Amino acid sequence: MLTIADKTFQSRLFTGTGKFANKHLMASAIEASGSQLATMALKRVDIRSEQDDILQPIIDAGVNLLPNTSGAKNAKDAIFAAHLAREALGTNWLKLEIHPDPKYLMPDPIETLKAAEQLVKDGFVVLPYCHADPVLCKRLEEVGCAAVMPLGAPIGSNKGIASADFLEIIIDQANVPVIVDAGIGAPSHAARAMEMGADAVLVNTAIAASQQPVEMAIAFKLAVEAGRMAYLAGLAGKVSHAVASSPLTSFLDE
């Protein structure tokens, strides 16, 4: 079980809602993944409708919504979007995203920290998307973020855990859950993140853009479970030389 702020999750696989061919496929994939938390950009939600066409399948499945501020270019934009999301969706949970560069979508660390500090004061449960920067993640924790979401690799790149060395430090020193977000392109990437000790992973593109999203969602579900189980079981340490798994010569003396 994973507890973040006031919610407890059985699944450690969080999902995104973008890039699916249609809303029905999105809902089916999320259900197959077992995910209990799905993030959605506020700009995709019709806040004037009480039963938004995109949101409803997720709500009907009992999945928690995590609105995000994708598209915000600075702290001011993100704070405005956050309050709009809370009013429209009735949740104080927020995935904080600030990436002013439209090409690489790198999160702005200065604006993210500034926005996070204010949003926590405003009563939000803040989950910030950020660089795999151990110092920044500690600062975000110190201002009251409920979890941190460092990137594995650039958004949508499917490059996997490119920031492994830094993620290991973040995981080691964190006192809040660490959710590896962005760049996870295969179930094996998700398993690796979990084996490292990450508390959860968030996956979108790898599921939505696959040829069979529902089957891929199941694959990610199993990978996350396997990775977590391996971490708890205790992985055998790495060594620089060969170590025989059985005696090489003792049987000759028998």
UniProtKB/Swiss-Prot annotation:
Cellular location(s): Cytoplasm
Enzyme category, top tier: transferase
Reaction it catalyzes: [ThiS sulfur-carrier protein]-C-terminal-Gly-aminoethanethioate + 2-iminoacetate + 1-deoxy-D-xylulose 5-phosphate = [ThiS sulfur-carrier protein]-C-terminal Gly-Gly + 2-[(2R,5Z)-2-carboxy-4-methylthiazol-5(2H)-ylidene]ethyl phosphate + 2 H2O + H(+)
Pfam family, one: ThiG
InterPro entries in alphabetical order: Aldolase_TIM, Thiazole_synthase_ThiG, ThiG
GO cellular component entries: cytoplasm
Residues annotated as catalytic: K95
EC id: 2.8.1.10
The UniProt record lists the keyword Transferase: yes
Functional pathway: Cofactor biosynthesis; thiamine diphosphate biosynthesis
Principal localisation: cytoplasm
Superkingdom as given in the UniProt entry: Bacteria
Gene Ontology biological process terms, A to Z: thiamine diphosphate biosynthetic process
Record: residues binding 1-deoxy-D-xylulose 5-phosphate: G156, A182, G183, N204, T205
Signal peptide: none
Self-association state and partner proteins as the record states: Homotetramer. Forms heterodimers with either ThiH or ThiS.
Family listed: Belongs to the ThiG family.
PANTHER family named among the record's database cross-references: THIAZOLE SYNTHASE
Cited function: Catalyzes the rearrangement of 1-deoxy-D-xylulose 5-phosphate (DXP) to produce the thiazole phosphate moiety of thiamine. Sulfur is provided by the thiocarboxylate moiety of the carrier protein ThiS. In vitro, sulfur can be provided by H(2)S.
Full protein name: Thiazole synthase
Species classification: Bacteria, Pseudomonadati, Pseudomonadota, Gammaproteobacteria, Vibrionales
